[in-house]
């Protein structure tokens, strides 16, 4: 830079605009989802699911593309394409008469079905979605394994085992609460009986005292009556004795 030349440092306004374009308004790429792997039996059919998320509304120009890479192969070939509301099955490859479109763009679904599976169908299938203006994003891949008989998945077995264990635990918890409820109910009944017995013992002495209080005047009356009777009999005996003396 020559001496006396004006400085070429960026202005603060330009720096703010650059920051806002990079940070405040980041581009959100389209996200595609598929299963990690699917299993199928020879002669059967299998559904390859494909869905996506986009920050934009579903466009009329949305497109789905499926590619297939054989097991052990290097190159992928296009086997299916959906655009302008119409499905197109590629005439190249062994899938041209065995692919069925079952997706619905309105529900962000780009799934296809492959019929009459064969061992040669083993490989990787890639789903690519474009929803203009949202066209930037990664594809998603699903690996197909074809067997003579579809093996039981490890996840299914694990889920069944976990479900069985949870069922046993819930049953034991239910049994525990039933036994506890019956025990508490019995304890409450015994407590009520004991309380009733204690109340009966407290009230019984009071009743006896009242009975004794009512019986006391009767006893005194009987005692006075016996004394008066005894005095009368003594007077009669004394009078008879004196009359006998006078006769003599």
UniProtKB/Swiss-Prot annotation:
Its membrane topology: Single-pass type I membrane protein
Keywords carried by this UniProt record: Cell membrane, Charcot-Marie-Tooth disease, Deafness, Dejerine-Sottas syndrome, Disease variant, Disulfide bond, Glycoprotein, Immunoglobulin domain, Membrane, Neurodegeneration, Neuropathy, Phosphoprotein, Signal, Transmembrane, Transmembrane helix
UniProt entry tagged with the keyword Lyase: no
GO molecular function, one term: structural molecule activity
Post-translational modification Phosphoserine, affected residues: 210, 226, 228, 233, 243
Signal peptide (residue range): 1-29
Disulfide pattern: 50-127
Location(s) in or outside the cell: Cell membrane
Extracellular side: 30-153
Tissue: Found only in peripheral nervous system Schwann cells.
GO cellular component terms given for this protein: myelin sheath; plasma membrane; synapse
Classification via CDD domains: IgV_P0 (cd05879)
Transmembrane segments: 154-179
Documented effect of changing residue 112 to T: In CMT1B; severe
Glycan attachment positions: 122
Entry comment on modification after translation: N-glycosylated; contains sulfate-substituted glycan.
Major place of residence: membrane
Annotated phenotype, changing residue 39 to P: In CMT1B; slightly reduces intercellular adhesion; does not affect targeting to the cell membrane
Spans annotated as Disordered: 224-248
GO biological process assignments: cell aggregation; cell-cell adhesion via plasma-membrane adhesion molecules; chemical synaptic transmission; myelination
Subunit structure: Homodimer and homotetramer.
Physiological role: Is an adhesion molecule necessary for normal myelination in the peripheral nervous system. It mediates adhesion between adjacent myelin wraps and ultimately drives myelin compaction.
UniProt record similarity statement: Belongs to the myelin P0 protein family.
Disease: Charcot-Marie-Tooth disease, demyelinating, type 1B: A dominant demyelinating form of Charcot-Marie-Tooth disease, a disorder of the peripheral nervous system, characterized by progressive weakness and atrophy, initially of the peroneal muscles and later of the distal muscles of the arms. Charcot-Marie-Tooth disease is classified in two main groups on the basis of electrophysiologic properties and histopathology: primary peripheral demyelinating neuropathies (designated CMT1 when they are dominantly inherited) and primary peripheral axonal neuropathies (CMT2).
Name this protein carries in UniProt: Myelin protein P0
């Amino acid at each position: 830079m020559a001496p006396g030349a004006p400085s070429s440092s960026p202005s603060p306004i330009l720096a703010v605009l650059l920051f806002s374009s990079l940070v405040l308004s980041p581009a959100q790429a389209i996200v595609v989802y598929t299963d990690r792997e699917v299993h199928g039996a020879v002669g059967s059919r299998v559904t390859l699911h494909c869905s996506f998320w986009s920050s934009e509304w579903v466009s009329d120009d949305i497109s789905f593309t499926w590619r297939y890479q054989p097991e052990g192969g290097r190159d992928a070939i296009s086997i299916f394409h959906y655009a302008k509301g119409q499905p197109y099955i590629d005439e190249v490859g062994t899938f041209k008469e065995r692919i069925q479109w079952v997706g619905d763009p309105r529900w962000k679904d780009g799934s296809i079905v492959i019929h009459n599976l064969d061992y040669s169908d083993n490989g990787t299938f890639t789903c690519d979605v474009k929803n203009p203006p949202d066209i930037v994003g990664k594809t998603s891949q699903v690996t197909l394994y074809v067997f003579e008989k579809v093996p039981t998945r490890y996840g299914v077995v694990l889920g069944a085992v976990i479900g069985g264990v949870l069922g046993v635990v819930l049953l034991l918890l239910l049994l525990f609460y039933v036994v506890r409820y019956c025990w508490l109910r019995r304890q409450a009944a015994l407590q009520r009986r004991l309380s009733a017995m204690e109340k009966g013992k407290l009230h019984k002495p009071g009743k006896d005292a009242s009975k004794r209080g009512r019986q006391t005047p009767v006893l005194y009356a009987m005692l006075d009556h016996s004394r008066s009777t005894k005095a009368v009999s003594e007077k009669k005996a004394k009078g008879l004795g004196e009359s006998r003396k006078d006769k003599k």
